From Swiss-Prot:
Pfam families membership: Exo84_C, PH_EXO84, VPS51_Exo84_N
Organism: Cryptococcus neoformans var. neoformans serotype D (strain JEC21 / ATCC MYA-565)
Protein name according to UniProt: Exocyst complex component EXO84
Record's keyword terms, sorted: Coiled coil, Cytoplasmic vesicle, Exocytosis, Protein transport, Transport
Family, as annotated: Belongs to the EXO84 family.
GO biological process, one term: exocytosis
Compositional bias segments (type: Basic and acidic residues): 399-416
Summary of subunit composition and partner proteins: Component of the exocyst complex.
Key word Phosphoprotein present: no
Subcellular location per the Swiss-Prot or TrEMBL entry: Cytoplasmic vesicle, Secretory vesicle
GO cellular component, one term: transport vesicle
């Protein structure tokens, strides 16, 4: 490997045959000798302690404006080679390397001290150049963002020669490479932190966008409410609180806004005006489009609907699509009409319930709306739509319950004060005594407020579905009404309250009695409550009607696989079993003998229903006589097992109704007589 040290121009290299005739060395002064030894030794030590870097390639920057192109030459080219001056041109050291130098022509013409002085200057220049590579210029000023590059270069290179300019450029290149490596190390060191911060920034950006949307909605709310943007009170010139005109018109503007909402809904949904008349305070709370209605039994899609949730009702609107295509002349108008929404259902929110169906399999984003025995299933496109609809319904329910509670409290306060006398009255009584005293000197001089308290107790008992307590209160009220017949005002007030509350109690008990999941003990208890209210006939009709509906429900669940005899057998089992159980339940609930005729009439109707279904199966053209006889035998067998053995013998009725001949007065069929 070649040495990194360059040949010095001060010490010539040539053949050993070249000899210099120095002559006798004159004595040197002592001070010059000491100066020379100290200076040369210092330079040599400094030179030996220098570190030399590797071969680094530096790109050549463009020349400075107004300056010579000093970057094209080697940055280190002038550190060791000096142009010989006039005083060195004649010396062997100055002419070393010249093309016209001959070995024979080199002669020593300079004294020894002059030659040693030239060597010291060359060594000093090399040492100064190497020592100032890192210390000559302060490049830390360039790290300041506000530094003026032109001013800095002008300050540093003022009066500099070509050598200093080259050294400055080399220092800049080294600083550039060092900064580049430091930047790479910093990037690699903080890469994981950079990725984490980027994720946090993206999350924060989404949160800011959501906050921006919410702030926009909040900003539009005062305008929709007919209010000013600011809710802070304003003061007039005198410092008094100023009333805004918008406060006076806020209620009126809000009603106009609600009316405009309903008008727009009428124009969008055909037939909605019939369900949604203008009512004070009625407004649209939430609407959802693109909802798919599912079959409650199979969960198969039926149609696309739109849901409109108002503060008191729920409107379901389907889309009406014309089967026929539109002509070109009136195409635009018919296309607009095609797909128009039509109101299908409208439910009161008080009677309504929404159930969140848990996601599973293909059943995703499904809600179930039930009203009594009616059930509807809907599927939304997104889970957010489903959640928003359920939250809106719950919020409206809470507001309705809160409003109902406040109205109840106001009603109670009104009832407490409605019977108090007016202080400014016309002298009908003292201010401290009620106006509705029952007689001036009755033993019981209580006012009529107890009637209101009685009505509140009965209302509360009905609300919490305590039927036993409700019936006791009704019986108490009926007894009190008979005892106060002499006082027309109290009697009329009590009777009016009973007439108002008893129908509600009876309807709710009847609804529970008509349930298909009712047990024997529960039905007997409910029937006894209605009997205590002198509604035995109503209880009988409600109970028997519910049993008839249950029978038809069980009949519809029978599968018909083509074998008529099996179908008739299952039909007879279902109908005869329900008749038998109904007889047992009926006799357990109604103890009076005069109520038995009602059950017999009902049982006769069910036997006739069975006979009608039986004849429909037998009247088919492909039914053979053997099949008919087999069906008759099955019917007679089930009649004996389920009815006749427990005392319900309807053989005569079945024999006459199932007689194959056209004359029902013929003798009973042999099957019924033989079984």
């Amino acid at each position: 490997m070649a040495s990194l040290r360059r040949p010095s121009t001060a010490i010539p290299r040539g053949p050993a045959s070249v000899q210099f005739d120095r002559g006798a060395r004159p004595p040197l002064p002592n001070d010059n000798k000491q100066k020379r030894m100290s200076k040369v030794g210092e330079k040599i030590k400094k030179r030996l302690s220098m570190r030399y870097g590797g071969n680094e390639s530096f790109s050549v920057p463009p020349p400075l404006p107004g300056a010579s192109d000093f970057l094209t030459a080697d940055p280190y080219g002038g550190l060791d080679i000096e142009t010989p001056g006039e005083d060195l041109a004649a010396s062997p050291f100055g002419l070393y390397g010249a093309s016209d130098l001959k070995e024979s022509s080199i002669q020593s013409s300079q004294p020894l001290d002059t030659q040693e002085h030239l060597v010291d200057e060359s060594i000093g220049r090399r040492g100064a150049a190497d020592a100032t590579l890192e210390e000559e210029w302060n490049l830390e000023e360039l790290s300041n963002e506000k530094v003026d590059a032109q001013a800095y270069v002008k300050k540093v290179l003022t009066g500099a020669d070509e050598e200093e300019k080259r050294r400055f450029v080399a220092a800049l290149m080294r600083e550039k490479q060092a900064n580049k490596k430091e930047l790479q190390r910093t990037v690699f060191k903080h890469y994981a932190e950079f990725v984490a911060i980027s994720k946090e920034i993206s999350t924060l950006e989404n949160d800011m966008l959501e906050l921006k949307e919410l702030l926009g909605q909040w900003k539009d709310l005062p305008q929709l409410m007919g209010m000013e943007d600011t809710l802070a009170p304003t003061l007039d010139r005198n410092g008094n609180l100023e009333r805004r005109r918008t406060q006076r018109k806020s209620v009126f503007d809000l009603q106009n806004l609600y009316r405009n909402q309903l008008t727009q809904l009428w124009s969008i949904v055909e037939g909605s005006q019939k369900y949604l008349p203008v009512v004070a305070g009625r407004h649209l709370v939430f609407e959802l489009h693109g909802v798919v209605e599912l079959n409650p039994a199979t969960y198969k899609p039926k149609q696309n609907v739109s849901i409109f949730l108002l503060n008191d009702v729920l409107l379901i609107a389907g889309k009406r699509r014309n089967k026929g295509g539109s002509t070109t002349s009136v195409g635009d108008e018919k296309d607009r009409d095609r797909g128009r929404m039509v109101a299908e259902r409208c439910w009161n929110l008080i009677e309504l319930g929404i159930v969140d169906v848990k996601d599973g399999g293909e059943l995703v984003n499904v809600i179930k709306v039930h009203r009594g025995k009616e059930h509807c299933v809907y599927r939304t496109q997104k889970s957010d739509d489903k959640r928003a609809l359920i939250n809106a319904f719950r919020q409206i329910s809470r507001e309705a319950n809160e409003k109902k509670r406040k109205d109840s409290e106001k009603e109670q306060e009104r009832r407490k004060t409605m019977w108090l006398g007016d202080k400014n009255g016309n002298g009908t009584g003292n201010s401290g005594h009620p106006l509705s005293t029952i007689g001036p000197s009755m033993a019981d001089s209580k006012d009529l407020r107890w009637i209101d308290e009685y009505g509140d107790e009965l209302t509360m008992a009905i609300a919490i579905r305590d039927w036993e307590e409700s019936v006791k209160l009704v019986e108490k009220g009926q007894a009190l009404s008979k005892s106060i017949e002499s006082n027309s005002s109290a009697h009329s007030l009590l009777v009016s309250r009973l007439e108002q509350l008893v129908p509600s109690l009876v309807s709710q008990i009847s609804h529970d009695l008509s349930s298909s999941n009712l047990r024997k003990s529960s039905s007997a208890r409910l029937i006894s409550l209605l009997v205590r209210l002198d509604l035995a006939d109503h209880a009988r009709d409600s109970f028997l009607e519910s049993r008839r509906e249950l029978m038809f429900k069980r009949v519809r669940s029978i599968k018909c696989d083509g074998d008529v005899s099996i179908y008739i057998n299952e039909l007879a089992v279902v109908i005869f079993t329900i008749i038998r159980h109904t007889s047992d339940w009926y006799m357990n609930a109604f103890k009076e003998n005069n109520m038995a005729s009602g059950f017999v009439t009902w049982a006769k109707q069910q036997i006739e229903t069975f006979a009608d279904l039986f004849r429909r199966q037998m009247d088919a053209p492909n039914i053979s006589e053997s099949t008919v006889n087999e069906c008759l035998h099955v019917t007679a067998t089930q009649n004996r097992k389920l009815l006749r053995d427990v005392g319900l013998d309807f053989t005569f009725l079945l024999s006459s109704l199932l007689q194959p001949s056209s004359n029902p007065s013929d003798y009973p069929h042999s099957v019924f007589t033989s079984v």
